[in-house]
Every structure is written in C-alpha cells, then in structure tokens.
Amino acid sequence: MMVTYTTVAVLITIFAIAEAKPKCKTFSQKDVVCTAGKTDYQLVRGLVSDNNKTTGITLRACRIYDIEYESFNDLNSLSYLDLSQNKIQNLKLGVIDEPKQLSYLNLSYNQLTEFPLGLFDQVTKLDLLDLRGNKINKLELGIFDPLTKLNFVDLSSNALVGKDLNPYIFDQSPHITFIDFSRNNMEGSPDNLLHAFQSLQILNLDRCFLKEVPSFATKPNLGTMKHLILSTNQISKLDNPATFVNLDSLELLDLTANVIETINPNIFSPLKNLQKVDLKNNIMKTIPDDLFRNMPKLISVDLYGNQLEEVSVNVFRGSPLKNLNLSSNRITYLQDNFCLELRNSGGKIKKFLFDPNPWQCACLHDLLKEVKRLGIEYNKGKYDGKRPVCVTTAEFNCKRQQNFNEMYIDMFNDVKEIHRNSRSA
C-alpha cells in the first residue's frame, strides 16, 4: 500500500510540474514561442536551452517568477529574448551570460527593482533594452558600461528619482538614439545626465514631474534630437528664448497637458527643422503675434484646450502650416478670410479644427463658408444639430472686437447649461 501511495504522490508531482511548465512551439526551426502553464513557473534549463539553431525566444506572460542558472545555455545563435509580462523580481548575476549574440532583450512589466553590477557584462551586443513597467529605483554606476552598442533604452514607468541618478551612468553607451524616462520623477536630474550621447534622436519625458524644461534635455551634444516629449508635466512658462537654441534638428516638440501660461515670442525661432508643435491642454490666454512666424518646415500646430480668445494670422506668417487645431478655446471670432489669409502668407492649410468654441453664429457662418469654398477639412461631425455650437443676438453680423467676447462667452455658457439641463430632465 505504501508503494501505491508513493507512486500516486510521484505521479501527482510530475503532473503538477507538467501543468506549470509553459508550452513551447518552434517556428521555422529557429523561433521559439511559449505560452503559460496553469501555475507560476521557475525557468530552468531544458525548456528553451540547448539549441544552437534558435535565434528568437518569446516567453511573454508565461508566469515566470524566477530564472535559474543555465536556463539559456547553449543558445549560441540567440539574438532575440522576450521575458516581458512575467513576475520576475530579480535576476541573478550570470543568468543571462550565455547568449552572447543577444541584441534584443525585453524585460518589461516584471517586478524588478535593481540589477546586480555585471549582469550585462557578457551580452555586449545588446542593441535594444526594454525595462519599462518594473519597479526599478536604482541604477548602479557601471551597469550599462559593457553595452557600448546600445541604441534603444526604455526605462519608463519605473520608480527612478532623477536627482539620485549618477550623471555618468550612460558614459559607455554614446550611441543611444532612443531613451524613455516617462512616468519617473526626473525633476532635479543632473544637468549633465545625457552628456555622453552623440546621436540621440528621441527623448521621452512624459509625466516626469518637471516644473520647467530640464537643462539636461537641451545641451549642445543633443543637436541630433528629432523628438522631444515633455507632455503631462507642470511646466508653467517658456520665457527663456535660448531654451531650445541647441536643438537644431528638432522636428517634434510635445508640450501637451502642462500649465503653460506665457511663452517668449522668440523661443521657437532657432528650431528651423520643427514640423510639429503640440501645446494642447495648457492655460494660455494669448500667444505672441510672431510665435510661429517664418518657421520653414512647420506644418502642424495644436492649441486645443487652452483659453485663447484671439488668434491672428500673423502668428503663422511665413510658415507652410497644413494642420491647425484651435478647438476648445474661448474664441468667438477670427479675422475675416482667416484661411485665405493663411494661404496668402505662406500657409498650406488643409485641415483646420475649430469646434467647440463659443462662436458668434455670424462669425462661424463666415468661417464654415470659407473652409468649404477652399476645400479645407474640418470637424464637420460637430454640426449635427444635437448640441449648441454658437450664439447670436438679434443683430446677425460678426463683431470682430475683443470687447464683445465676454458677452458672447457668457451667452454660450448659459446656452450650454440650458441644453445640459434639458437633456438630463
């Protein structure tokens, strides 16, 4: 009877291990893709190891909580390894030493907090390192030193504190072209944090608790940068005309969802390659008359969700503007023949979004006639008769004077309130 019980226990154990083990399939004799078993799993040698033909391994969401030594032994052709969306809390020193041809390593969305110094010493060909969505709060000086070929680094959505980062952390990785710090606290980071970079193109600082444009993001060595993302921070003003003077190659500047109220009229002047500026969801009441003037490559400006009451054609004069968004401001009128004047002053306007705003009906009528006549795309779906889009007095003509603005804005807010109440009644 004891033998029977022992046999049953062994069978149950074997069955449990089999149930926990991810199921793997090989495609084209070189790409291994695994799916999760029914319980959490400790990765050990034998599941994906010992195959010199394997070039790619995907262990995404396989409920892996730990990786044992030799799990990746004898994978001399492996270049792609995806361990994302697991439950890994730490990586032991030496655990990824074997696949020396590795160029892509995805460790995103695990529970990592830090790395032992030397972890990457043997994978010197890494080109892409994805660490987003972990709990990393510390980067040991020297951790990236072996990664001289690193090109893409994603550190977003971790627990990094910029003021605690060593400014020499990337000194041996000068060829990084993409780095993402978004959803970390980067306020107070060292001014020379990125001083080693020689060819950075994209820097993402979204949701980084920044109160101003950080100086580490605008240094002279970053003249190669094409995209600078500063959205969803606490930047309140752009008053220094020299802020972006070093960023000659910049094509996209995203300042969405800050608290910007004032902008120096010359702040964008050095950006001769700028194509798109996103300033939506700030609190600007006015914009300088020459803010976007004579910018030879500027084609898109988004000013949605500010508090603008007046926007002059002069703001864009001499720029080849194609797309303009003025929706959700406090605009009751635009100057007569606004779109035609844009085109006559160098613009190539093709798409113009201007609703909702507290329009005077006569002014909106003139604008709609103009965009239709010129074949300009606009948000026509807003004009379905289901909600108020403008207000008028008995005198139906467009009053293009600022002193009338408050009256029409108040009227529009009253009409919206009445409409809201009637729908909820």
Identify the meaning behind each predicted range.
Residues 2-425:
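Extracellular leucine-rich repeat
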